């Protein structure tokens, strides 16, 4: 049935839908592909289409199959549909059809394709001859089982020692191991199972190596790509020749160029390159120098001389790419090697087939399935042996009135085959509705095949007369005009079918549709010129991180967010900002930069989990328990905070027996040495006993219980919770425990297997990801990868890391894989022990390079289209010469030349190369896209502000003002006038506790806790009971709904007053009341306190303090530090002599410390209320208050005296009483 326009209802004037959206909702009668650009409302359209099929066409919801990409999107889709059905039912309560839908929605097939396949298998398991009580394998189980399968298969082939297998191992294994060989087998496994017929795909891999016609096709493909570079080289050489021809005394240069012109003319004549000429060509070792004589003869033409030489250098680099990448060997050699490689490739394919079969058997024996089994078993149910739809498939065809597929660009060929089995009709009369955007296809690493979308996009038409119907949703309801028009301009000159795999034409571009006001927010393209190592101690990446922090500050201080619903502005907050990068490689630098600037920052990284200190500690423990003969992990455990062996102690142990193979042997030998330090021997005895205890425990208990025992025995959770970032550290430790629980629920058991599982994850670079401890509404700046940002939107997007090179590492592998073309293997001469490129490896390497750049372009598109208000692009260069080079990228018609795009090294080359051209006044017309951008229409007119910043200019040293916060981290930068004191303070506050703490005692206590403990002990209370309470009690943050709507409690007002006092400026000209109000307003602007806090701040009490003598004494002090944290050893503070006494690490926070004439004072603020009993004098009240805080103040004073090695005085300041001096 054809789509008839009359079948689509007339669109009323008052509906919100665009014409294209309206058509997408109501069109039917054939397969429909909706190309939905970013922000075009595709989800809303999909939901509305489902609803209208139910309401208008009386289709039951359970007769629609809706396929989404994730379980989360499936749940959201189902919820939206259910809500709309309920709304319709309330409006028409007597409608029986709607009443039925409210029941049937619970059986509706709105799910991922994997979920649909699983349901299919559960209903038709008899066709597969499998046990119906199967379960889904865990990640750990699947990884280990595949590894074990590869072990078994390779072992079988090692036993056979087939000559071709020997050649493969010689080529793909190293002298030490066969890791690379195994990795290639795994890659081939995953590539093959992404096809409907894995064995058939594998069997075809050797065909190009055998069949001459396929080799000729590969030669033509290489020729076409090489010709692009050779012609570009010819143009560069011609430009060089033209410039040198205008000059004097350059005969030698012209002679060289003339020789090269003869060569390249001969190489590119005809349609086929002369490969013999190219392979045999040799350049002059050095181009004739442009000496002073030439410069004198061409006075005033220095720039032209340099430009002529640059064109020649560019020509040479282009020819060298062709020579090295495409024709390092002549055509005859390339084809001859293919014949010799054929049996080797066939044997490799056979190994992978053996792995697939054996892996299937292993899974069957355990009665488990993985996600690829879901797809292949479903396909087995839906197809006959000849590939035609089965009887079961026919029943599903009859059942489903329509199949709707979201994110169609991310499907693979197996999924495409499944859909084709259950859809009805052909494309011209089918019932398949597909929504997606190929410009956002960024999952090639998961075997997503964007060519499926592209093929349909090119085949379907907007009229739908010949095949399927194509509808373009191009209107964007997310972003401001500046974001859209700049994105359009960039991609119109960067993306086409040659590089990008799709033409960015009028249908593909974005059109402004959001109801923003007319305030201009141009895209910022920021180029950061690095400071040299002479001018900065920071690396380029660290400089960029600091630069990004400055952009965030600028947004917070100057930008507003427009609410499209109300038409009002609000101030920008941290949660409005996201930093997007290609990967998490810059995460650590950004975390440090934001931490240094006290800006809340969160990165939910999928990388770096195994690098976290707390995780490394536990893994060292597990590896040591499994095998203590691993020196790195054993010593790491000994040096850890748990056992605290010093470097001196480790050296002392090693010196006794320096020739031992393992450090564990050295420990044993030291313990029996007559001259050994008895104290160290005792310490080692306790350590060895611990190891043996845990080894015995691990023999009978699962891994997660071993981890739990380690946590409890040594208070690991409590210790790491007390450090900076304690929430995240605690979550990471629990995350590792949970992974161990999941592992034990698989068919694998034991410590060794768990460690192997972890090692495999690390080798695959497949992290768990740091545990997420931040909610969606938390006011923090977020960093995420472009992949994880897909589908999200943010008012402000900082797209950084643009200068990071594209990852082309896979292109250098000895085996190149391509889903469409197959396998390209280098030729390895076993006798010469040398590898050479083969015809297939050269061709597939070139194809993969092109596809890689295309996917990187799509990633750029996704990043740019996340922004609502403003987009900030950040790239980094060594010097401004690089920027000039980018501006001068060659232009071919309306695009950056193909050769420039294929050789681009990073996104910044492309982005800056396009957007900077129209703003470069000196650029010749042949390097521009247009002479005047004002002639462009609004949809493609770039609105971009280009800023070039030198790091030296934007990185001013932090100036310490009287009213700034002094923290431990800033002590290095503060000039106290007493360097010895400063060094001692820093060393003591950063001190690593060297002695083993009794593991049954808390590892860390606050001064307040010690105060309670000592008060309790003085009352003869049992210590263990107090410790149990202190460790076990939960400390929860007060929920926001309580703090926002209820009157503040006394402790909250106390915290608020401390925050105000922490930032209070001290100056000899006292603050006035108006200035105090202005200061509080600044704290609200900086979000240090809530806006409604003003009414709870006791202004009069603070003014009383400001007008008092203590304020003036502090204002006149030599140095002032506020909110100074400390972590010290209780032994040092209390003067204890034995490490076996009840000791802990003490932590606390001193409100203020100041120094006057060499004397240090501390001040502790108190907001306590007190009862003045009748007849009590001020002196009596003061004594009562001092007695109440005597223990706490004693610890503060002793702590500071321990650190500073000098007497310290202190004050208690009560806002409701006044100043009390601490007694000696």
UniProtKB/Swiss-Prot annotation:
Record domain UvrD-like helicase ATP-binding: where: 15-480
Record-linked InterPro entries: AddA (IPR014152), DNA_helicase_UvrD-like_C (IPR014017), DNA_helicase_UvrD/REP (IPR000212), P-loop_NTPase (IPR027417), PDDEXK-like_dom_sf (IPR011604), PDDEXK_AddAB-type (IPR038726), Restrct_endonuc-II-like (IPR011335), UvrD-like_ATP-bd (IPR014016)
Disulfide bridges in this chain: none
A Pfam family of this chain: UvrD_C
Catalytic activity, as annotated: Couples ATP hydrolysis with the unwinding of duplex DNA by translocating in the 3'-5' direction; ATP + H2O = ADP + phosphate + H(+)
E.C. code: 3.1.-.-, 5.6.2.4
GO biological process terms held by the UniProt record: double-strand break repair via homologous recombination
Binding site for ATP: 36-43
Listed cofactors: Mg(2+)
Keywords for the protein's UniProt record, in alphabetical order: ATP-binding, DNA damage, DNA repair, DNA-binding, Exonuclease, Helicase, Hydrolase, Isomerase, Nuclease, Nucleotide-binding
UvrD-like helicase C-terminal domain sequence ranges: 497-791
One Gene Ontology term, aspect cellular component: DNA helicase complex
GO molecular function term, any single one: double-stranded DNA binding
Matches recorded under HAMAP family: AddA
Quaternary structure note: Heterodimer of AddA and AddB/RexB.
Role noted for this protein: The heterodimer acts as both an ATP-dependent DNA helicase and an ATP-dependent, dual-direction single-stranded exonuclease. Recognizes the chi site generating a DNA molecule suitable for the initiation of homologous recombination. The AddA nuclease domain is required for chi fragment generation; this subunit has the helicase and 3' -> 5' nuclease activities.
PANTHER family: ATP-DEPENDENT HELICASE_NUCLEASE SUBUNIT A, UVRD / RECB / PCRA DNA HELICASE FAMILY MEMBER
Protein name according to UniProt: ATP-dependent helicase/nuclease subunit A
Organism of origin: Staphylococcus epidermidis (strain ATCC 12228 / FDA PCI 1200)
Gene behind this protein: addA
């Amino acid at each position: 049935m054809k789509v008839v326009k009359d079948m689509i209802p007339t669109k009323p004037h008052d509906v919100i839908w665009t014409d294209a959206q309206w058509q997408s909702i109501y069109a039917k009668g054939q397969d429909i592909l909706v190309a939905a650009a970013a922000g075009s409302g595709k989800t809303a359209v999909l939901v509305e289409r489902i609803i209208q099929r139910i309401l208008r066409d009386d289709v039951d919801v359970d007769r629609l199959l809706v396929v989404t990409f994730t379980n989360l999107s499936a749940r959201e889709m189902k919820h939206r549909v259910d809500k709309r059905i309920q709304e319709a039912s309330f409006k028409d309560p007597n409608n029986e059809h709607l009443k039925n839908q409210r029941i049937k929605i619970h059986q509706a097939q709105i799910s991922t394709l994997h979920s649909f396949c699983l349901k299919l298998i559960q209903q038709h398991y008899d066709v597969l001859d499998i046990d119906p009580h199967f379960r889904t394998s865990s990640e750990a189980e699947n990884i280990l089982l595949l590894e074990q399968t590869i072990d078994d298969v390779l072992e079988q082939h090692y036993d056979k020692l087939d000559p071709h297998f020997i050649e493969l191992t010689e080529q793909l294994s190293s002298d030490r191991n066969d890791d690379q060989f195994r990795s290639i087998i795994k890659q081939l496994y995953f590539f093959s199972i992404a096809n409907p017929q894995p064995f058939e795909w594998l069997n075809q891999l050797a065909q190009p190596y055998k069949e001459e016609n396929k080799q000729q096709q590969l030669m033509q493909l290489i020729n076409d790509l090489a010709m692009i570079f050779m012609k570009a080289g010819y143009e560069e050489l011609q430009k060089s020749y033209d410039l040198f021809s205008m000059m004097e005394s350059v005969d030698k240069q012209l002679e060289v160029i003339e020789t090269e012109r003869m060569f390249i003319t001969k190489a590119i004549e005809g349609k086929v390159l002369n490969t013999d000429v190219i392979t045999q060509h040799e350049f002059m070792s050095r181009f004739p120098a442009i000496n002073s004589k030439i410069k004198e003869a061409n006075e005033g033409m220095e720039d032209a001389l340099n430009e002529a030489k640059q064109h020649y250098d560019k020509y040479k680099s282009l020819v060298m790419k062709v020579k090295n990448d495409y024709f390092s060997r002549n055509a005859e050699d390339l084809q001859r090697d293919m014949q010799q490689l054929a049996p080797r490739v066939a044997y490799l394919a056979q190994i992978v087939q053996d792995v697939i079969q054996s892996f299937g058997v292993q899974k069957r024996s355990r009665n488990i399935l993985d996600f690829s089994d879901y797809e292949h078993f479903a396909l087995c149910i839906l197809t006959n042996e000849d590939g035609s739809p089965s009887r079961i498939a026919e029943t599903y065809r009859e059942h489903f009135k329509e199949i709707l597929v979201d994110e169609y660009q991310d499907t693979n060929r197996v999924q495409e085959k499944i859909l084709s089995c259950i859809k009805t009709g052909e494309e011209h009369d089918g019932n398949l509705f597909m929504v997606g955007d190929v410009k956002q296809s960024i999952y090639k690493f998961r075997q997503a095949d964007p060519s499926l979308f592209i093929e349909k996009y090119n085949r379907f038409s907007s009229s739908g007369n010949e095949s399927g119907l194509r509808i373009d949703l191009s209107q964007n309801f997310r972003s401001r005009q500046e974001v859209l028009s700049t994105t359009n301009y960039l991609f119109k000159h960067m993306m086409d079918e040659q590089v990008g795999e799709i033409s960015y034409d009028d249908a593909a571009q974005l059109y402004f549709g959001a109801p923003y006001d007319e305030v201009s927010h141009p895209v910022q393209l920021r180029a950061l010129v690095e400071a040299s190592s002479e001018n900065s101690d920071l690396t380029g990446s660290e400089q960029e991180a600091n630069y990004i922090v400055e952009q965030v500050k600028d947004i917070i201080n100057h930008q507003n967010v427009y609410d499209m619903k109300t038409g009002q502005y609000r101030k920008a907050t941290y949660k409005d900002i996201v930093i997007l990068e290609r990967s998490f490689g810059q995460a650590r630098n950004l975390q440090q930069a934001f931490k240094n600037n006290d800006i809340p920052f969160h990165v939910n990284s999928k990388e770096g989990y195994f690098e976290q200190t707390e995780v490394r500690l536990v893994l060292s423990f597990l590896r040591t328990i499994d095998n203590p003969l691993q020196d790195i992990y054993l010593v790491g455990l000994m040096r850890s905070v748990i056992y605290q062996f010093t470097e001196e102690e480790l050296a002392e142990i090693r010196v006794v027996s320096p020739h031992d193979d393992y450090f564990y042997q050295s420990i044993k030998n030291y313990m029996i040495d007559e001259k050994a330090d008895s104290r160290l021997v005792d310490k080692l005895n306790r350590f060895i006993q611990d190891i043996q205890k845990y080894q015995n425990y691990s023999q009978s208990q699962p891994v997660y219980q071993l981890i739990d025992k380690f946590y409890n025995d040594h208070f690991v959770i409590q210790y790491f919770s007390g450090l900076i970032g304690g929430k995240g550290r605690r979550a990471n430790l629990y995350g590792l425990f949970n992974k161990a629980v999941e592992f034990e629920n698989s068919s694998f058991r034991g410590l060794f297997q768990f460690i192997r599982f972890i090692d495999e994850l690390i080798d695959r670079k497949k992290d768990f990801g740091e545990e997420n401890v931040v909610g969606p509404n938390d006011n923090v700046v977020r960093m995420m990868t472009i992949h994880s940002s897909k589908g999200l939107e943010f008012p402000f997007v900082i797209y950084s890391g643009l200068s990071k090179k594209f990852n082309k590492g896979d292109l250098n592998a000895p085996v190149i894989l391509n889903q469409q073309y197959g396998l390209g293997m280098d030729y390895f001469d076993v006798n010469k022990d040398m590898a050479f490129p083969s015809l297939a490896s050269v061709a597939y390497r070139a194809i993969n390079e092109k596809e890689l750049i295309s996917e990187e372009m799509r990633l750029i598109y996704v990043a740019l289209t996340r922004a609502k208000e403003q987009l900030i692009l950040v790239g980094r260069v060594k010097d401004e010469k690089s920027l000039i080079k980018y501006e001068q990228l060659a232009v071919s018609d309306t695009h950056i030349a193909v050769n420039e795009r294929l050789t681009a090294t990073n996104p910044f080359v492309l982005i800056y190369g396009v957007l900077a051209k129209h703003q470069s006044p000196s650029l010749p017309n042949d390097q521009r896209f247009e002479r005047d951008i004002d002639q462009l229409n609004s949809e493609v007119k770039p609105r971009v502000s280009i800023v070039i910043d030198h790091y030296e200019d934007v990185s001013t040293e932090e100036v310490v003002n009287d009213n700034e916060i002094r923290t431990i981290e800033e002590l290095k930068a503060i000039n106290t006038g007493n360097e010895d004191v400063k060094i001692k303070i820093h060393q003591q506050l950063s001190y690593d506790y060297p002695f083993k703490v009794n593991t049954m005692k808390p590892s860390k206590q606050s001064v307040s806790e010690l105060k309670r403990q000592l008060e309790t002990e003085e009352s003869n209370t049992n210590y263990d009971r107090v410790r149990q309470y202190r460790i076990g009690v939960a400390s929860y943050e007060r929920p926001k709904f309580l703090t926002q709507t209820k009157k503040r409690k006394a402790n909250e007002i106390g915290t608020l007053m401390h925050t105000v006092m922490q930032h209070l400026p001290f100056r000899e000209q006292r603050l006035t009341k108006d200035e105090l109000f202005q200061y509080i307003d600044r704290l609200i602007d900086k979000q240090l306190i809530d806006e409604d806090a003003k009414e709870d701040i006791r202004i009069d009490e603070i003014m009383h303090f400001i007008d008092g003598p203590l304020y003036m004494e502090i204002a006149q002090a030599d140095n002032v530090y506020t909110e100074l944290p400390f972590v010290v050893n209780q032994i040092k503070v209390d003067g204890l002599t034995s490490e076996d006494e009840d000791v802990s690490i003490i932590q606390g926070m001193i409100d203020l410390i100041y120094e006057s004439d060499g004397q240090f004072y501390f001040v502790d603020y108190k907001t306590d209320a007190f009862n003045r009993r009748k007849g009590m004098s001020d002196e009596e009240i003061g004594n009562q208050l001092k007695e109440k805080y005597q223990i706490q103040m004693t610890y503060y004073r002793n702590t500071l005296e321990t650190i500073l090695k000098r007497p310290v005085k202190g004050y208690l300041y009560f806002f409701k009483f006044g100043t009390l001096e601490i007694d000696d």
